[in-house]
A protein has these predicted regions:
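N-terminal segment of the mature folded domain
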Residues: 68-125
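A bilobed periplasmic-binding-protein/Venus flytrap-type ligand-binding module shared by bacterial periplasmic
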Residues: 117-128, 263-275, 298-299
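Short, polar/charged alpha-helical segment
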Residues: 41-59
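Short, well-ordered beta-strand elements
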Residues: 28-41, 59-64, 154-158, 283
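C-terminal lobe and pocket-closing loops
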Residues: 222-287
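C-terminal segment of classical bacterial N-terminal signal peptides
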Residues: 15-24
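A conserved helix-loop-strand patch within extracytoplasmic ligand-binding domains
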Residues: 104-159
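Ligand-binding pocket segment of bilobal, Venus flytrap-like solute-binding proteins
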Residues: 73-74, 81-89, 158-239
């Protein structure tokens, strides 16, 4: 915690957010509880919010351990914590909209980090060497550029470890784009460390890599991965929620589609907006450029911060 807090002090002082610090005026806002989620970017944001709310607005801010669904449920049912700085809302859009409509929660900031999201990525060097292969569909025609270590005649697509929800989506997209017919193998990295290791190994050796990842993360910042757009448009929530995101046996006919757009909000309770209106305005206006966030996450990893 001390290491993260130290980094947060640096971030609060140095990272450019959309709100000018010169405009901050102290205001009594009372007690504020902030969800500190169990991944790096959300933890950093929570610590920065705590520092700014305390030092800039005179709040008595406290960090509360959290995770996506438990935090949303607690805020919705108990009105606490007051702030969830980085809440990935795709999995519970309807309950969130219901809570907002019924006056319990407020989506204070619909874009606290720019350039984030899940999808399929390649190293930047691959695009420099192959500028014409700038969409997923074009890359899928060239499995020979990503040889699978156990069968060089096949291309390797690195998916998520078993047990992750994204593994289901990747497996169904693999079928939807007929990747097996095109000469691809879906490779399970075995673990989060295995996934990260496959990227670092490929980049360090100057080899090509193609697979799933997400941003903001230290891995994206450190290894310079680029998300590849799909030519296929998003085929709708029904296809995604009722097929792509489900186990294969529940998705008989997956349609080719781009990745579901990730939605991340800073969510606050309605009571916090009323009682700490000036501080709530800060939450609504602070934005982290994705490149800056990734660089901060790399700094945290490299310095064990």
């Amino acid at each position: 915690m001390k290491r993260v807090t130290g980094t947060a002090f640096m971030c609060a002082a140095a990272v450019t957010v959309s709100l000018s610090m010169a405009d901050i005026a102290k205001a009594e806002c009372g007690d504020v509880t902030i969800a500190e989620m169990n991944w790096a970017s959300a933890s950093l944001m929570a610590n920065v919010d705590k520092i700014i709310l305390q030092e800039g607005y005179g709040c008595n801010a406290e960090l509360i351990p959290g995770d996506t669904m438990p935090t949303f449920t607690s805020m919705n049912e108990k009105g606490a914590p007051d702030v969830a700085p980085e809440l990935w809302v795709n999995a519970f859009k309807e309950p969130l909209q219901k809570a907002i409509g019924e006056g319990r929660l407020v989506s204070a900031n619909a874009g606290p980090i720019t350039g984030l999201g899940e999808g399929w990525w390649v190293p930047s060097k691959f695009l420099e060497d192959n500028p014409e292969l700038n969409t997923v569909e074009k890359i899928l025609e060239r499995p020979d550029l990503f040889p699978y270590s156990e069968n060089k005649s096949k291309g390797a697509f690195m998916t998520c470890p078993s047990g992750w929800a994204c593994q289901l989506a990747n497996a169904n997209l693999y079928r939807a784009f007929e990747m097996e017919k095109k000469g691809w193998v879906l490779v399970d990295p075995g673990s989060s460390a295995g996934l990260d290791g496959s990227i670092s190994k490929a980049v360090d050796r100057g080899e090509n890599w193609f697979g799933y990842y997400w941003s903001p993360t230290a891995v994206i910042g450190k290894y310079g991965l680029k998300m590849i757009p799909f030519e296929a448009s998003f085929a709708g929530n029904d296809n995604w929620n009722n097929c792509i995101a489900l186990p294969e046996q529940d998705c008989a006919n997956p349609k080719a589609t781009s990745w579901n757009e990730s939605e991340v909000n800073s969510v606050i309770t309605a009571d916090f907006k009323k009682s700490g209106s000036v501080a709530a305005e800060f939450i609504a206006n602070r934005v982290y450029p994705g490149k800056v966030m990734n660089e901060m996450l790399v700094f945290m990893v490299d310095n064990q911060a």
